[in-house]
């Protein structure tokens, strides 16, 4: 797919380079660029040393990119060198922006006024020393457009070939600045050659990647214009995400591909608009009251269900019943049931779900009990054995249910995360059929 505007990303910070902090900015900026029709050439990560930062800038310039976006290194400390390096790279002097310096000073005053521990710093003499220490953040490349700070660090956009957008490292500061940064004249000129395209996401669950790959090979011959579709797939939490980018002229080809996938994998294709299973479950739970009973996942499912505003409208509560005694005392599971079938069994999962419905007066419940490892497995029930029970019905009454046992692959973390995904999909299916 021909795309003329190209960009590169430089993520700075020794803490990111060494893995102490996971990079959230690179992927986020990449998504925003792709949404704009800008081809992403490279994402590079380097430490805080100036010559390393400059080397990354020169590398990207040598690749012929039209735009470089950097994140990090805009603070007041000695190792925050990104703006200085970018100025040198662009052949521009650093100058003090008095207006920005005043804005930073006002931000500092407000922050300190809200924190009693810093009240003494508001003394005029002390504050002036602090203000001077932060003055570095108001030094910007001559001719650059300054982006108002969200924290205390302003961003800058430096015109040129390539143009450079310099953004702070904390995502909570970087993301609000992005829209303003990309709308600046320098950034718009840099990406003027971008291709207008559409991007769609399909989500599938229960379909192996090999199965999707086989269908896509079939589509190459069966779908006219298939070659105009840029398709990427990603396996995440046991699901397949398929992202397709295409120019508007290839819309018919995409529609035919979607129909082929729907015809062959309709049971596994659960989202055609990019909605996550969490989104779908939240909608399906409207007007209901759900409770969870978890053993091996230790509250991860409850956390996932409540990881959105408004979840208190339908989440009643949850129980983490890790021990057999907790299953009996908190969920009313008969100890004889555990003795006969074992804690990791379908009868116990059913009893846990019924107990959760009863305890929270809920009409919907999900129970998970399993062996996440690395120990605890047996020949009959190896590590990765997980039992699920989803129930829909008034507490104390007979409920519609789906109870099953699965063997999930991976390490302890993988098994626990996959278990929550399976539970969400079992819940989605049962509620959809309600």
From Swiss-Prot:
Q: Which InterPro entries match?
A: CinA, CinA-like_C, CinA_C, Competence-induced_CinA, MoaB/Mog-like_dom_sf, MoaB/Mog_dom
Domain of life (superkingdom): Bacteria
Instruction: Spell out the SMART domains in the cross-references.
Output: MoCF_biosynth (SM00852)
HAMAP family, sorted: CinA_B
Q: Give the family from UniProt.
A: Belongs to the CinA family.
UniProt protein name = CinA-like protein
């Amino acid at each position: 797919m021909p795309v003329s505007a190209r960009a590169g990303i430089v993520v700075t910070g020794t803490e990111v380079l060494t893995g102490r902090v996971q990079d959230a900015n690179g992927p986020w900026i990449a998504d925003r660029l792709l949404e704009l029709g800008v081809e992403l050439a490279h994402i590079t990560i380097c430490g805080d040393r100036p010559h390393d930062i400059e080397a990354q800038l020169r590398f990207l310039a040598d690749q012929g990119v039209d735009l470089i976006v950097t994140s990090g290194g805009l603070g007041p400390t000695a190792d925050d060198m990104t703006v200085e390096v970018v100025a040198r790279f662009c052949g521009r002097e650093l100058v003090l922006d008095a207006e920005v310096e005043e804005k930073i000073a006002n931000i500092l005053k407000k922050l300190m006024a809200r924190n009693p521990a810093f009240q003494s710093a508001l003394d005029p003499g002390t504050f002036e020393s602090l203000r001077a220490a932060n003055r570095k953040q108001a030094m910007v490349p001559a001719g650059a457009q300054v982006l108002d700070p969200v924290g205390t660090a302003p961003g800058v956009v430096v015109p040129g070939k390539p143009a450079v957008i310099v953004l702070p490292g904390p995502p909570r500061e970087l993301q609000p600045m992005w829209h303003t940064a990309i709308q600046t004249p320098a950034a718009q000129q840099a990406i003027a050659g971008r291709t207008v395209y559409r991007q769609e996401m399909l989500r599938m669950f229960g379909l192996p990647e090999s199965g999707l790959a086989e269908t896509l090979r079939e589509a190459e011959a069966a779908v006219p214009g298939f070659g105009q579709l840029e398709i990427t797939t990603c396996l995440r939490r046991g699901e397949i995400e398929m992202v397709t980018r295409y120019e508007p002229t290839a819309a018919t080809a995409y529609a035919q591909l979607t129909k082929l996938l729907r015809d062959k994998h309709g049971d596994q294709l659960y989202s055609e608009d990019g909605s996550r299973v969490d989104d779908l479950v939240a909608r399906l739970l409207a007007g209901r009251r759900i409770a969870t009973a978890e053993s091996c996942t230790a509250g991860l499912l409850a956390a996932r269900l409540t990881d959105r505003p408004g979840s208190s409208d339908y989440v009643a509560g949850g129980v983490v019943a890790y021990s057999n005694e907790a299953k009996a005392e908190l969920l009313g599971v008969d100890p004889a049931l555990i003795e006969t079938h074992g804690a990791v069994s379908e009868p116990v999962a059913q009893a846990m779900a019924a107990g959760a419905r009863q305890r929270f007066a809920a009409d919907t419940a999900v129970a998970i009990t399993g062996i996440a490892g690395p120990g605890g497995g047996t020949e009959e029930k190896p590590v990765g054995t997980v039992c699920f029970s989803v129930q829909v019905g008034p507490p104390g009454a007979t409920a519609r249910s789906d109870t099953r046992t699965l063997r999930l692959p991976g390490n302890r973390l993988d098994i626990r995360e996959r278990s929550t995904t399976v539970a969400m999909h079992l819940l989605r299916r049962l509620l959809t059929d309600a």
